[in-house]
């Protein structure tokens, strides 16, 4: 091989997206992220509905991800319908995301980060997205630097391919109500699960899906204000108590798909085969069959 050809091959290889300096898991710590702020193959996404909160302070180098480009209001004031693959693809490219990069998503509201995580897995980025443990609040509590400067970046280039086996429908669930290896986990609080709320959001039939176990999503973290995820052993105990044994399929749902996003994330963290019922109780509770 001539020296000139070797130089060309090496230059071509360097032009390809390189993996992060260290492969992260689904959950990364503030210290890990602090060590990777300058890693060109790690893109940090600050997820929020309002850009003003991002502008008031964010993790250095973080790109703003508008939650309105991830979800839209299918019904007034609910804002929970997943946008199309093309729309989310465009949102990521506008956020400077390109093929081969690893995404770390965080937010002040842990449900925003979890919803983005779930959505990006549905859009084919499983293995390429992580969530920041403790969120933005945890980052600040740990004394890490905050910036008000928006980073400069070019539009990214990525081509998403949806993963069709994550989202499930009411019919899919109905066919598996008697399946002992399918664990339905309701991420809502007690009053919604029991139906004492009277039918939040105008659902015709208050209550829960037959056989579903109730595990309020906030049980998965230290607190909503300090959303550090509980230990692996603590999470395992919660899911086993909810009827999810090793090898089972966990199906997460809530009212409209926000709270269940965190349940989805926790189940993935534990290694369960995990499904997401995006229609949730707003769909099931209005059905007549």
Model-predicted segments: where are they?
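Sec-dependent signal peptide recognition
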Residues: 1-8
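Hydrophobic h-region of N-terminal signal peptides that target proteins for export
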Residues: 8-18
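Active-site neighborhoods of enzymes that stabilize oxyanions during catalysis
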Residues: 20-29, 35, 73, 136-210, ...
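Mature N-terminal segment immediately following signal peptide/propeptide cleavage
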Residues: 22-49, 61-67
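Solvent-exposed loop/turn segments at secondary-structure junctions
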Residues: 49-52, 68-72, 109-112, 136-139, ...
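Helix-loop module immediately N-terminal to the HCX5R catalytic loop
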Residues: 72-99, 217-250
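Thiolate-centered catalytic microenvironments shared by cysteine-dependent enzyme domains
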Residues: 82-172, 176, 207, 259-282
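C-terminal soluble interaction/assembly domains
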Residues: 237, 242, 247-289
């Amino acid at each position: 091989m001539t020296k000139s050809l070797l130089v060309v091959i090496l230059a071509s290889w360097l032009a390809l997206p390189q993996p992060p300096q260290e492969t992260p898991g689904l959950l990364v710590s503030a210290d890990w992220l602090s060590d990777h702020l300058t890693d060109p193959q790690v893109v940090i996404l600050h997820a929020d509905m309002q850009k003003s909160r991002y502008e008031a302070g964010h993790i250095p180098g973080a790109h703003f991800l508008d939650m309105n480009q991830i979800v839209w209001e299918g019904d007034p004031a609910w804002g929970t319908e997943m946008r199309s693959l093309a729309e989310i693809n465009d949102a990521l490219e506008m956020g400077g995301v390109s093929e081969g990069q690893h995404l770390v998503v965080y937010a002040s509201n842990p449900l925003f980060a979890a919803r983005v995580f779930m959505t990006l897995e549905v859009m084919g980025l499983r293995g390429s997205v992580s969530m920041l443990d403790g969120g933005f609040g945890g980052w600040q509590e740990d004394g890490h630097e905050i910036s008000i400067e928006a980073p400069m970046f070019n539009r990214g280039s990525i081509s998403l391919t949806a993963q069709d086996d994550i989202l499930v429908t009411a019919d899919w669930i109905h066919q598996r109500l008697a399946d002992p290896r399918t664990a339905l986990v309701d991420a809502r609080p007690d009053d919604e699960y029991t139906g004492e709320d009277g039918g939040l959001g105008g659902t015709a039939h208050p209550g829960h899906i037959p056989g579903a176990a109730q595990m309020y999503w906030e049980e998965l973290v230290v607190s909503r204000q300090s959303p550090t995820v509980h230990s692996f052993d603590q999470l395992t105990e919660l899911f086993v108590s909810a009827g999810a044994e090793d090898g089972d399929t966990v199906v997460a749902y809530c009212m409209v798909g926000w709270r269940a996003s965190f349940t989805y994330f926790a189940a993935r963290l534990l290694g369960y085969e995990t499904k997401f019922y995006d229609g949730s109780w707003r769909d099931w509770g209005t059905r007549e069959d």
